[in-house]
Amino acid sequence: MDPEKFYSDAIDYWNGVQPTVDGMLGGLGTGRIPQTDVVGSRTFLNRLNYRIGKIENLVAADCGAGIGRVTENVLLKIASHVDLVEPVENFISTAKKQLATKPCSFINVGLQNWTPEKNRYGLIWNQWCLSHLTDEDLIAYLSRCCEAIQEKGVICVKENVSSFEDTFDPIDSSVTRCEQSLKSLFKKANLVVVAETLQHGFPEELFPVKMYALVPHSS
């Protein structure tokens, strides 16, 4: 796989997607899926309150933030400030307009090129974006996240998971990884899984979606 083409093809694809909830969710944004997704994420974060609930003035990062759907409906419910990290200019511009009155900052960069500030975050949320990183860049990115979270901080991953083997999609230039691959990459980034769960309520024809809470091995 040519990394440069892998990344440029993904940006080309997303540049052609409308900056709407329906666009962010691949045409599934008008039914029950958006709310089901939000409820699942909030419920998962409630399980982590024993860690992140102890952090005053929690700052969160919404990685692969799109138009800010997760920031608005999930992260701002628990965070005093959210940094939205998103490589697609049209999406980040839309997010700025929709969240203009909210305590948010906007970072227009791909995760493979983002170096988060050390010890800034109580929560780094990654949803439907890590499939757009190569294995090497994913390990490096998660390693940087390790240094960016505070003592009680958590890195969360919410991604599609394939059943048997990693699956490349040439349409949006993404790799849906199997659980074994994901956990191997987490381990290589010196992260351990402290909580995980399956997202319920999504159509059976879609890939299963899993949530993982990760902390540095020494935590």
From Swiss-Prot:
The keyword Thylakoid is annotated on this UniProt entry: no
Residues the record lists as binding S-adenosyl-L-methionine: G64, R69, L111, Q112, Q127
InterPro entries named among the record's database cross-references: MeTrfase_NTM1, SAM-dependent_MTases_sf
Keyword set, alphabetical order: Cytoplasm, Methyltransferase, S-adenosyl-L-methionine, Transferase
Keyword S-adenosyl-L-methionine belongs to the record: yes
GO cellular component, one term: cytoplasm
Catalytically driven reaction(s): N-terminal L-alanyl-L-prolyl-L-lysyl-[protein] + 3 S-adenosyl-L-methionine = N-terminal N,N,N-trimethyl-L-alanyl-L-prolyl-L-lysyl-[protein] + 3 S-adenosyl-L-homocysteine + 3 H(+); N-terminal L-seryl-L-prolyl-L-lysyl-[protein] + 3 S-adenosyl-L-methionine = N-terminal N,N,N-trimethyl-L-seryl-L-prolyl-L-lysyl-[protein] + 3 S-adenosyl-L-homocysteine + 3 H(+); N-terminal L-prolyl-L-prolyl-L-lysyl-[protein] + 2 S-adenosyl-L-methionine = N-terminal N,N-dimethyl-L-prolyl-L-prolyl-L-lysyl-[protein] + 2 S-adenosyl-L-homocysteine + 2 H(+)
Protein name (Swiss-Prot/TrEMBL): Alpha N-terminal protein methyltransferase 1
